[in-house]
Amino acid sequence: MGILFTRIWRLFNHQEHKVIIVGLDNAGKTTILYQFSMNEVVHTSPTIGSNVEEIVINNTRFLMWDIGGQESLRSSWNTYYTNTEFVIVVVDSTDRERISVTREELYKMLAHEDLRKAGLLIFANKQDVKECMTVAEISQFLKLTSIKDHQWHIQACCALTGEGLCQGLEWMMSRLKIR
């Protein structure tokens, strides 16, 4: 009886799942957010603070917070961590010079108590650009295989065309089903 009630509750319960979208400046975070919410590319300028949109997929509601990635704003990322279920890290696959900064910020986040149960989705953005880093290279640079206490997935994407974004959302949806 308890299992049946749980399944019925899940069908009608439209719980909101908090997602934060982080990454260095110019990685494509805002473009990805608006691809999710409007399915189109919008003109963006550097995010000061955050943008927030509700995305509904198959009766599952995600409240997505796109947080500014400039160096001066990164120290305030932790103010968004409370109740976060998923962290989306957007990596600019063309930015070889700052991949080590991305790694440093990633591990700083993962060590935070408020994110101990959060799933991690890495979007390797700008895969349409010639000579960008591959998903395998980014995975190696970020040392993703060393992450043992978080479920994680890396997904190649192009924010401008939307390619790869649905696969990332599908991974998040699959994580919700096994909870």
From Swiss-Prot:
Keywords: GTP-binding, Lipoprotein, Myristate, Nucleotide-binding. Coiled coil: none annotated. PROSITE patterns: ARF. GTP binds at residues 23-30, 66-70, 125-128, 159. One of its GO terms (molecular function) is GTPase activity. A lipid is attached at residue 2 (N-myristoyl glycine). InterPro entries: P-loop_NTPase (IPR027417), Small_GTP-bd (IPR005225), Small_GTPase_ARF (IPR024156), Small_GTPase_ARF/SAR (IPR006689). SMART domains: ARF, SAR. SUPFAM superfamilies: P-loop containing nucleoside triphosphate hydrolases. Pfam families: Arf. GO terms for biological process: intracellular protein transport; protein localization to Golgi membrane; vesicle-mediated transport. Lacks ADP-ribosylation enhancing activity. Belongs to the small GTPase superfamily. Arf family. This is ADP-ribosylation factor-like protein 5A. The gene is ARL5A.
